[in-house]
């Protein structure tokens, strides 16, 4: 059984990517695993039967339950300085989540692909920033001003790596 948004996944991720129907039949989903600077994470792509929306949920299950106050500080800062994704921490399993929803009803697959996957790459960078900032905060105990300075330097370095690695065959600069 295929979903009408399967071509979007195929073009944006890999040819074998396709949505699977949930057990209760209300939603369709696909899980993409990706590697980034701070480790391995996943993204759940969810939609409904009609393909009226596409929700992306990034998750990292390795955050753990130690240093929760520092993590919540970083999450609050990042939720406050950008509005592209919302971050959540699940106390029950020690996982970090980031969500963003796109209304895609009435759009052509190519439009959806361009809209979603450009933002997906940016979401992964922002997600990596939160994990990096959390690690930095735990290691240094620094204040907010020092955190912003360190994060700006981290992002400059990321941009340099992406620019340097563009054009290397088989290399995706989003994972630099």
Task: Identify the role of each PLM range.
Residues 37, 62, 104-105:
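Short, surface-exposed beta-strand-loop junctions and turns on beta-sheet-rich folds
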Residues 26-30, 52-54, 94-96:
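Hydrophobic residues embedded in beta-strands of well-ordered beta-sheets
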Residues 124-125:
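Helix-rich interaction surfaces within compact, conserved domain-sized segments
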Residues 41-67:
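Short, conserved beta-strand/beta-arch hydrophobic-aromatic motifs that form part
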Residues 90-117, 121, 132-139:
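Well-ordered alpha/beta subsegment
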Residues 131-176:
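Short, highly charged C-terminal tails/helix-capping segments
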Residues 57-99:
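Short, internal acidic amphipathic alpha-helical interface segments
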Residues 1-42:
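Charge-rich, low-complexity N-terminal segments
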């Amino acid at each position: 059984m295929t979903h009408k948004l399967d071509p979007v996944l195929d073009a944006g991720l890999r040819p074998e990517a396709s949505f699977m129907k949930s057990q209760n039949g209300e939603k369709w989903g696909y899980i993409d695993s990706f590697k980034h600077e701070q480790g391995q994470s996943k993204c759940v792509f969810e939609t409904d039967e009609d393909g009226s929306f596409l929700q992306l949920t990034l998750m990292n299950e390795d955050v753990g339950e130690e240093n929760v106050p520092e993590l919540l500080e970083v999450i609050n800062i990042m939720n406050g300085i950008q509005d592209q994704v919302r971050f959540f921490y699940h106390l029950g399993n020690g996982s970090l989540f980031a969500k963003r929803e796109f209304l895609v009803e009435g759009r052509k697959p190519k439009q959806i692909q361009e809209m979603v996957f450009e933002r997906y790459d940016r979401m992964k960078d922002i997600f990596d920033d939160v994990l990096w900032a959390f690690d930095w905060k735990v290691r240094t105990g620094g204040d907010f001003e020092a955190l912003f300075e360190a994060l700006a330097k981290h992002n400059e370095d990321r941009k340099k790596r992406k620019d340097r690695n563009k054009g290397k065959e088989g290399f995706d600069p989003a994972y630099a």
